[in-house]
Amino acid sequence: MFGVTLAELSASLGDPVLALGLAAFALLLLAIPISFWMVSGGSNSAVVTLLVALANLVLTAQLVLRWWQSGHFPISNLYESLCFLAWACTLAQLLVERSLSSPIVSAAATPMALLCVAFASFALPETLQEASPLVPALRSSWLVMHVSVIMCSYAALLVGSFLSMAVLFTDRQQTLELRSSSIGTGGFRQAKLATSAIDQNDGLRLSSINLSRTEQLDSLSYRTITVGFLLLTLGLISGAVWANEAWGSWWSWDPKETWALICWMVYAAYLHTRFSRGWSGRRPALVAVAGIVVIVVCYIGVNLLGIGLHSYGWFFEA
């Protein structure tokens, strides 16, 4: 799928938009091994943050240039939407790192943006990478409102879900019990260690370093997913209004609409377990990780099928 000939790579370098995409790919590719090295060494993640910030600036320049070339908001085909999603993921990562500057955050979040840029640059055929005129139905101000909000919601949900995945790796044999809301300061929590690790004389032992890091990741994932869920809700509502204006129907059970609703329900279940049932740690993290699969099916799977109003086209046939 990712086979790219030397001639195709040379042609990409000749197109400034595609060249900027390759530059962002190189920066993110460099950031990932450094972030994992910093996780193992416990070093500061400033270098990775700088690389991700540079990648975000490059992607910004790419989107602005494509906007200027095409004359419309650059989110009308699969290549543009993938680059926009990568831009939103890097922005979400930078915002999260303002709350917790940790190499674990970089190691968890950076691969998502890299995969988006890699898929856009190396997997898609040239016909799906080129700018094309908008079809009449997309020539609406709702394009920017609806699609950009949906893409930003995916970015926040994916970054939050990958942080939840990091919770699964850092929460070694510990179960976090929520004593107050994770939103804000995080409240008070305690750790129940595995039975084999409990000293009957000492009772409950607390590992302050591991617990603190896991707590922070757990709280950050909760807050990030909450923001993503609100954006997804806004995106679905704006999409329904747009659909009613364009086709006279609020909801048509298009494959993308159906999977977007499933995605909304998965993350609604995640927030319900956190807010109403008081879950934290591993159990809600597993729900968030399941959400990653649903987003991939909703965003990429529908396009592979090439059916429905939201499909960018079946790129295997391009």
Curated annotation (Swiss-Prot):
InterPro entries: Cyt_c_assembly, Cyt_c_biogenesis_CcmC, Cyt_c_biogenesis_CcsA, Cyt_c_biogenesis_CcsA/CcmC. It is found in: Cellular thylakoid membrane. The keyword Transcription regulation does not apply. Disulfide bonds: none annotated. The chain crosses the membrane at residues 17-37, 45-65, 75-95, 104-124, 149-169, 224-244, 258-275, 287-307. Signal peptide: none annotated. Pfam families: Cytochrom_C_asm. One of its GO terms (cellular component) is plasma membrane-derived thylakoid membrane. Coiled coil: none annotated. It is a multi-pass membrane protein. One of its GO terms (biological process) is cytochrome complex assembly. One of its GO terms (molecular function) is heme transmembrane transporter activity. Keywords: Cytochrome c-type biogenesis, Membrane, Thylakoid, Transmembrane, Transmembrane helix. Belongs to the CcmF/CycK/Ccl1/NrfE/CcsA family. HAMAP family: CytC_CcsA (MF_01391). Required during biogenesis of c-type cytochromes (cytochrome c6 and cytochrome f) at the step of heme attachment. May interact with ccs1. PANTHER family: CYTOCHROME B_B6 PROTEIN-RELATED, HEME EXPORTER PROTEIN C. This is Cytochrome c biogenesis protein CcsA. The gene is ccsA.
